[in-house]
């Protein structure tokens, strides 16, 4: 039996996942992270994108987070996210529409235009779309 670590994924809405996993793969601000049991303690911020959990037996479960923090202790991994969705619940058409709307907002700057907010919306929509496309490519759905 493979070694495991306890993982919690929590958002403002509540706990999304709690259980034993063999590995957590996430997109940190400085690059990708692979967290296995016994990993050195760390805290880092997370970029919008997928978090992949390899559960006992090798089954993978993917979540989309809009950003947040990752805390690693030797026997525990905690993801504190702004918002979390199961990747299977993401809709590619909606994500594509959000990307187009964000790009349009950037191109049509109005009087009350906030560049920082517009680029953040574009980055989040693009991350959702990438997550959906990666899952479709990997699992053929």
UniProtKB/Swiss-Prot annotation:
Regions crossing the membrane: none
Membrane topology per record: Peripheral membrane protein
Key words of the record: ATP synthesis, Cell inner membrane, Cell membrane, CF(1), Hydrogen ion transport, Ion transport, Membrane, Transport
Pfam families xref list: ATP-synt_DE (PF00401), ATP-synt_DE_N (PF02823)
GO MF, one annotated term: ATP binding
One of the record's GO cellular component terms: proton-transporting ATP synthase complex
Known function: Produces ATP from ADP in the presence of a proton gradient across the membrane.
Family as reported in the entry's similarity comment: Belongs to the ATPase epsilon chain family.
Xref: HAMAP family: ATP_synth_epsil_bac
Name the record gives this protein: ATP synthase epsilon chain
Species this chain originates from: Pseudomonas savastanoi pv. phaseolicola (strain 1448A / Race 6)
Gene coding for it: atpC
């Amino acid at each position: 039996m493979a070694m495991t670590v306890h993982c919690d994924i929590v958002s403002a809405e509540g706990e999304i996942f709690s259980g034993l996993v063999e590995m957590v793969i996430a997109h940190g601000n400085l690059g990708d992270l692979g967290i296995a049991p016994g990993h050195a303690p760390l805290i880092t911020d997370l970029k919008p994108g997928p978090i992949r959990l390899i559960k006992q037996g090798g089954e993978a479960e993917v979540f989309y987070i809009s950003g947040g923090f990752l805390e690693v202790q030797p026997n525990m991994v905690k993801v504190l996210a702004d918002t979390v969705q199961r990747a299977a619940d993401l809709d590619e058409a909606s994500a594509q529409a959000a990307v187009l709307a964000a790009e349009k907002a950037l191109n049509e700057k109005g009087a009350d235009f906030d560049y920082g907010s517009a680029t953040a919306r574009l980055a989040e929509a693009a991350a959702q779309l990438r997550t959906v496309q990666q899952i479709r490519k990997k699992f053929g759905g």
